[in-house]
Amino acid sequence: MTEVEERINAWNDGFEELLSYIPAKLYYREHTANQWKQKKSTLEEKKERRKMKFSLDGLVNDADDDSQKSSKWEQSSTMSDDTDVSDRHAESMSQIRGKLASKIQDLREKRKAGDLNQKRQNKRPVENEKDSQKGSGKSKVQKKKHKASPRAGF
């Protein structure tokens, strides 16, 4: 067993020597050191983020953030015509928002008008059913109760 242990130790020493030639920055990540120092978000911060997610003001702020992020990216990638591109991006976003708001409003108006028409149409057949039931003298529920089932004898 001593020979085996000596061989293993020799291999281990050789392997450790090879590893010593590799700089540590190649196999250790820098951001892992900060990973454990990061604070967890508090309950209030989570609530604020959730509110911003569903509020219209949050959409405006997100669009501003997106335009700032995109403009930073454009500045780093290309230095020419960066103001024209960011202006077009901001204009297109505002136009899209305007179109979306108008479509939503149109759909709401159509829905209100459609609901009124449906309510009117739904009331008419109900009145007709009542008239037909009055003439027969028995309601549909009473007719079903008196009907014998085919398995009544079993």
UniProtKB/Swiss-Prot annotation:
Give UniProt keywords alphabetically: Nucleus, Phosphoprotein, Ribosome biogenesis, rRNA processing
**A matching Pfam family:** RRP14
Locate the Phosphoserine modifications and list their residues.
80
Q: Which residue ranges run through the membrane? A: none
Modified positions (Phosphothreonine) in chain numbering: 83
Q: Where is this region: Disordered?
A: 36-154
Q: Where in the cell is it found?
A: Nucleus, Nucleolus
GO MF annotation list: DNA binding; RNA binding
Write out the biased-composition intervals (Basic and acidic residues): 105-133
Q: What's this protein's function?
A: Involved in ribosome biogenesis and cell polarity. Required for the synthesis of both 40S and 60S ribosomal subunits and may also play some direct role in correct positioning of the mitotic spindle during mitosis.
**Family statement:** Belongs to the SURF6 family.
Protein's recorded name: Ribosomal RNA-processing protein 14-N
